[in-house]
Regions:
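Helix-turn-helix DNA-binding module
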Residues: 4, 142-159
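Short, charged helix-capping/linker segments at alpha-helix termini
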Residues: 5-14, 24-43, 53-61, 157-158, ...
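Acidic, proline/glycine-rich intrinsically disordered inter-domain spacer in sigma factors
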Residues: 10, 93-119
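Hydrophobic-face residues of short alpha-helical interaction/recognition segments
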Residues: 23, 27, 67, 71-79
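Structural recognition of an alpha-helix C-terminal capping motif at a helix-to-coil junction
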Residues: 41-48, 61-73, 162
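Short, basic/polar amphipathic helix motif occurring as a linker/hinge flanking DNA-binding modules
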Residues: 68, 78-100, 179
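Short amphipathic alpha helix immediately N-terminal
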Residues: 127-144
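DNA-recognition helix of helix-turn-helix
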Residues: 153-174
């Protein structure tokens, strides 16, 4: 374990943005686009837990694995707590145990690029307009905040927030699969 110092703040921020994109891509693929808000929330919780734990106990030898496991466990815990667990399981897949195994496989180094590419196609779904595609991609895959996106696109923060919220709702209602499109669709 390595100690976490104030000077490593920029590295930690970069690491978290990078890992956040991987996690959101993999977990959305596993649990479905309808769960993207829960997934983003639980990834943030895992990141906060990491910051707190690492300040006290140092950075683990494999910080990526630590965050991946924490985020996955938070989502599984949240799904177990849902009032309509049967509905959650039917939306998420066959069983939570099967989902857990799938997530482990998809978090492997070989699978991460595919998951990110799949998520990029979801963020750029043809039902979304170009500006919304850009905002959703910057938020979901690049880890930018609403204010950063708004500043870059020269739009009010609230406009960006609403676009991203509507895009997630639209993709969820359409139950867009987190898969690669057919070659003739590209």
């Amino acid at each position: 374990r390595r100690s976490m110092t104030d000077s490593s703040g920029h590295l930690v921020e970069h690491f978290f943005r990078h890992e956040s994109a991987h996690l959101i891509a993999v977990l959305t693929r596993a649990f479905g686009i309808r769960r993207i808000d829960l997934i983003e929330d639980m990834v943030q919780v895992a990141m906060l837990e990491a910051m707190n734990a690492w300040k006290q106990g140092g950075v683990p030898d494999n910080p990526s694995a630590w965050i991946h496991r924490a985020a996955k466990n938070r989502i599984l815990d949240a799904l177990r707590r849902e009032k309509t667990l049967a509905q959650a399981i039917s939306l998420a897949g066959p069983t939570l145990d099967v989902q857990e195994n799938i997530v482990e496989e998809w978090l492997s180094e070989e699978q991460l690029p595919d998951s990110l590419l799949r998520m990029m196609f979801v963020c750029c779904h043809p039902t979304l307009n170009r500006e919304t595609q850009i905002a959703l991609t910057l938020k979901t895959l690049c880890g930018f905040g609403h204010a950063e996106i708004a500043g870059g696109l020269l739009l009010p923060i609230e406009t960006i927030r609403k676009r991203i919220t509507r895009a997630k709702r639209s993709l969820g209602e359409a139950n867009v699969a987190v898969e690669l499109p057919c070659p003739d669709e590209i």
